[in-house]
UniProtKB/Swiss-Prot annotation:
Species in which this protein is naturally found: Mus musculus
Protein name: Small integral membrane protein 7
Similarity field: Belongs to the SMIM7 family.
InterPro entries: SMIM7
Gene: Smim7
Localisation: Membrane
Membrane topology annotation: Single-pass type I membrane protein
GO cellular component, one term: membrane
Bilayer-spanning residue ranges: 54-74
Ranges per topology, Extracellular: 18-53
PANTHER family documented for this protein: SMALL INTEGRAL MEMBRANE PROTEIN 7
Signal peptide (from-to): 1-17
Length: 75
């Protein structure tokens, strides 16, 4: 059960890190505009952009997960 959860999290993190969409930050229009709460879409976009910076960490996590799957969860 815990192996399935770790595998699911790893695959989800990999999918987010390798997305190749042109995600752009939302531009502000000027000084007169009041800052609004970021929408859910804006939060998701920011999260995916931040995942791209952690590709090396994600690659090391993948190697660690492969070793765990062989050593701990192998039958």
């Amino acid at each position: 059960m815990i192996g399935d959860i770790l595998l699911f999290g790893t695959l989800l993190m990999n999918a987010g890190a390798v997305l190749n969409f042109k995600l752009k930050k939302k531009d502000t229009q000027g000084f007169g505009e009041e800052s609004k709460e970021p929408s859910t879409g804006d939060n998701i976009r920011e999260f995916l952009l931040s995942l791209r910076y952690f590709r090396i960490f994600i690659a090391l996590w993948n190697v660690f997960m492969m070793l765990c799957m062989i050593v701990l969860f192998g039958s």
